[in-house]
Amino acid sequence: MAVKSYQAGVTQYRQSYWQPDYMPLDTDILACFKITPQPGVDREEAAAAVAAESSCGTWTTVWTDLLTDLDYYKGRAYRLEDVPGDDTCYYAFIAYPIDLFEEGSVVNVFTSLVGNVFGFKAVRALRLEDLRFPIAYVKTCGGPPHGIQVERDKLNKYGRPLLGCTIKPKLGLSAKNYGRACYEALRGGLDFTKDDENINSQPFMRWRDRFDFVMEAVQKAEHETGERKGHYLNVTAPTPEEMYKRAEYAKEIRAPIIMHDYLAGGLCANAGLANWCRNNGMLLHIHRAMHAVIDRNPHHGIHFRVLTKILRLSGGDHLHTGTVVGKLEGDRASTLGWIDLLRESFVPEDRSRGIFFDQDWGSMPGGFAVASGGIHVWHMPALVTIFGDDSVLQFGGGTVGHPWGNALAHANRVALEACVQARGEGRHLEKEGKDLLTAAAAHSPELKIAMETWKEIKFEFETMDKLAVANK
């Protein structure tokens, strides 16, 4: 066997990291990047540079390469594809050996795959479009603390989406008035109320006061309605120690569910909190605040389907996924894709929904998809169709904004049950939605007023991040 010798100097990345004949292993972590190269940098060299800089390569030859098996540990760019309708960029597929990453650490995965390489000068823009996690890696991660079935069993609620409300105004209420708003919404027929993502422990409402008044509201509504209720108590905090302190107090006052901002709070904190929830029988609601900073630019950043996979591995029983019909970004096909990635046990490659790889989750439980952001009763037929039963339909202004106060909690429940009944009868909810709601409103003045109030409200803006699908 020839002995390799060290030769100082600079070589092209493609000599070591571009391997078009490579067949990915079942244990490899696979990535699809969208690369916009700098002028004069060819495709293979740019893809190889990304593979090198996101694994074990650097800009020059180093003598310590001879102290390890570089051929085993390096990332390999193995395929390039055109982006339909955009000749300024292309897809690069890269395979990484599983041993490059610490077991069960999505933090470590992100440190490599979306670390310094995103500032690399050889590329003008770089976006991580998708990841394939092998089952060997999935099994090292904690995943959702409980999952869909366990949550339904805890709540004793089956056969329909769950209903929620984000309390408004999101900032400025006193703890007592905040609790009052929660009580009215829960008593009116909702399953959950929710802290907004930016409610932590501000001077106008300290966290302990909020927790106490809210749980009083939850318990009172439960006694009056005979249904299990809950409120997402946001335990996101300045430090992990303070976060756990708030979680422990939520457990002490018998709260069924807490909440965390997983991107703003950090993936390390989120994984730790998910483990705590698993060990303490607490459900975990996840908000995605900050995601659009990362995922909205179609050429640079991280696609939300990747953030969804990372959250499922890190741990969360609920995740906000957008609405398609509301005020937030997200086209229908892409949204359905990442909803499946959150809930299903196996999701096949489907380019029409932006899914670049098969993803096998094994026995890892799925989480509820949360539809939230600019939705109201007129959206109910579409929401039930798009999201199905394993979802939380979260109306904020669409509950608290009713002319009769929180009467819209009752209106939302009536609209939901009318849609679920019609679906069971085989009716087409989106085509017959207006007739269904009008018939239900004949027996619900609360729903009738809500329909009048929001009949002209639409959010018809063009989606910034469109699926790139080849013409057939």
UniProtKB/Swiss-Prot annotation:
Catalytic activity: 2 (2R)-3-phosphoglycerate + 2 H(+) = D-ribulose 1,5-bisphosphate + CO2 + H2O; D-ribulose 1,5-bisphosphate + O2 = 2-phosphoglycolate + (2R)-3-phosphoglycerate + 2 H(+)
Co-factor remark: Binds 1 Mg(2+) ion per subunit.
One Pfam family named in its UniProt record: RuBisCO_large
InterPro entries assigned: RuBisCO, RuBisCo_large_chain_AS, RuBisCO_lsu_C, RuBisCO_lsu_C_sf, RuBisCO_lsu_fd_N, RuBisCO_lsu_N_sf, RuBisCO_lsuI
Keywords noted in UniProt: Calvin cycle, Carbon dioxide fixation, Lyase, Magnesium, Metal-binding, Monooxygenase, Oxidoreductase, Photosynthesis
Amino-acid positions noted as binding Mg(2+) in the UniProt annotation, renumbered to this chain: K194, D196, E197
GO molecular function: magnesium ion binding; monooxygenase activity; ribulose-bisphosphate carboxylase activity
Residue positions binding substrate: N116, T166, K170, R288, H320, S372
EC number: 4.1.1.39
Site (Transition state stabilizer): K327
Biological-process GO terms, alphabetical: reductive pentose-phosphate cycle
Stored PROSITE patterns: RUBISCO_LARGE (PS00157)
Active site: K168, H287
Top-level taxonomic group: Bacteria
Sites bearing N6-carboxylysine, chain numbering: K194
Cofactor: Mg(2+)
Uppermost EC category: lyase
Entry's family note: Belongs to the RuBisCO large chain family. Type I subfamily.
Any further remark recorded for this protein: The basic functional RuBisCO is composed of a large chain homodimer in a 'head-to-tail' conformation. In form I RuBisCO this homodimer is arranged in a barrel-like tetramer with the small subunits forming a tetrameric 'cap' on each end of the 'barrel'.
Subunit structure: Heterohexadecamer of 8 large chains and 8 small chains.
Described purpose of this protein according to its UniProt entry: RuBisCO catalyzes two reactions: the carboxylation of D-ribulose 1,5-bisphosphate, the primary event in carbon dioxide fixation, as well as the oxidative fragmentation of the pentose substrate. Both reactions occur simultaneously and in competition at the same active site.
Protein name listed in UniProt: Ribulose bisphosphate carboxylase large chain
